[in-house]
Amino acid sequence: MADKYHITLDTSIKLSTTQIPLTDYDLTIVLGNLFDNAITACNDVENAVITVKLQTIRNTFTIYVENSYNASKKHSSDNDFDFIHGYGLKNVKNSVEKYNGFCIIDPQNCLYAVTCIIPLNQII
């Protein structure tokens, strides 16, 4: 999909499938919505890049998605989860919170990053 829109995709996965605390359903909700939002945000950006990282860090499962975006098109909102993508990010937040996790949204200049951190049930 990224190739279709001329977006450079950088991925890093540093874990085994046994280290993913989410169900397949919830993982699909999180990654699907974050990736869909990233592609949408990159549509009108030249040399767009999407970075996706999945890894375990200090007994947490971390999902990190960063993408280029046109900062001048940012809509103001009191709630970052309502920013541009509405239900998609709400669904991400709801899925992550089911596992006692949380999301950090960090829009800066021309990069938009979402980090989801979910505690692991056991020490790895």
Show where each model-derived region lies:
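Glycine-rich ATP-binding loops of the HATPase_c
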Residues: N100-C110
